[in-house]
Regions:
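Sec-dependent N-terminal signal peptides
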Residues: 4-13
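Charged catalytic cores and adjacent phosphate/nucleic-acid-binding surfaces used
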Residues: 19-38, 54-57, 118-126, 164-303
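Conserved catalytic scaffold of divalent metal-dependent phosphoesterases
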Residues: 156-158
Length: 303
């Protein structure tokens, strides 16, 4: 009679980071894909934020981001009396100029800011944000669609529009999803996560996103000096370009990084984990059936 073999594992981890800048958000590329670290929802003084666009660019570069989108509110302009700006593309133009000597890709976007339904949504890859200024909320979405923007539902669980933090899915939302007027959904916004929004993404095949929606200072909001990080969307694109990024977003090739956790669908989440962890060495401890395995972690995730 054969005796069962009991094999024990002793696992150690090494981290493949230099430690020169611990705040940089770092994840490996996947076979055939570039992993782009993106924050696609933020504000400056050109809507209701507290900083000039150059600060958003500087913060993004410090965090090692690949892509940001300027997404000022179309309808809500807190500082318009102090900073008049008839051109709603101005925030983007400034940010793009400030980023010209870096590798940061800046997208033109706007936040369509309406009552529920449909609520708030971001349209990115815009050609002209001014054309989204209209009384009819659906006309704003249709104009964004006309400009081939990628449109996603912002903070559907936001307490100001959903007091119980549920996702108030309306028939209008379903019609908009069916007509490609909503292509993605924030499952993470700022410091909040919605499991219901994630389920909605699964049910309606929406792209999942996580964003900072930052209005003030990134370092203060996410306690960067204490080891925190902003929420971001990891987008798996063929190359770092607007066209490739847009295609990847439309194909749902994303994972969210939030509070030191990875959230996503298995088709890209599992490859990301597999490419983050590598077996560095494996050997038996003398005179035992214990295998000492050393794994290398070349990502920010604390596996």
């Amino acid at each position: 009679m054969q005796k069962p073999l009991l094999l024990s594992l002793l696992i150690s981890f090494t981290v493949a980071h230099s430690g020169k800048n611990d705040r940089i958000i770092d994840f490996p590329d996947l076979p055939g894909f570039k992993t782009l670290v993106c924050d696609l929802h933020m504000h400056t003084v050109f809507s209701d934020g507290s900083v000039w666009p150059n600060i958003r660019v500087m913060e993004a570069n410090k965090d090692g981001l690949d892509v940001i989108a300027t997404t000022e509110h179309i309808e809500y302009q807190s500082w318009i009396s102090d900073i008049p700006h008839p051109d709603r593309n101005r925030s983007y133009d400034l940010a793009k100029g400030f980023a010209k000597n870096s590798d940061l890709l800046v997208l033109n976007g706007s936040e369509i800011t309406r009552d529920m339904p449909p609520g708030h949504a971001n349209a990115i890859f815009l050609k002209d944000a001014n054309k989204l200024i209209t009384d009819d909320p659906i006309e704003a979405f249709l104009e964004a669609r006309k400009q081939d923007a990628f449109i996603f539902w912002n903070h559907p669980h936001w307490a100001s529009q959903s007091p119980d933090a549920s996702v108030p899915l309306d028939q209008l939302h379903i019609e908009m999803i069916n007509n490609d007027l909503i292509e993605g959904i924030e499952i993470v916004n700022d410091t909040t996560y919605s499991n219901e929004a994630f389920q909605l993404a699964l049910d309606y095949d929406l792209t999942i996103l996580g964003t900072s929606d930052i209005h003030e200072i990134i370092d203060w909001q996410y306690r960067i000096p204490s080891g925190g990080h902003r929420p971001v969307t990891l987008v798996f694109a063929r190359e770092k370009s607007e066209s490739s990024l847009k295609k990847a977003l439309r194909n749902g090739q994303t994972v969210v990084w939030f509070n030191k956790k990875l959230i996503g669908k298995s088709d890209f989440l599992l490859p990301l984990i597999n490419n983050s962890l590598k077996v560095k060495s494996a050997s038996y401890i003398s005179n035992t059936t214990i295998v000492h395995v050393v794994l290398s972690n070349n990502s920010d995730a604390p596996f």
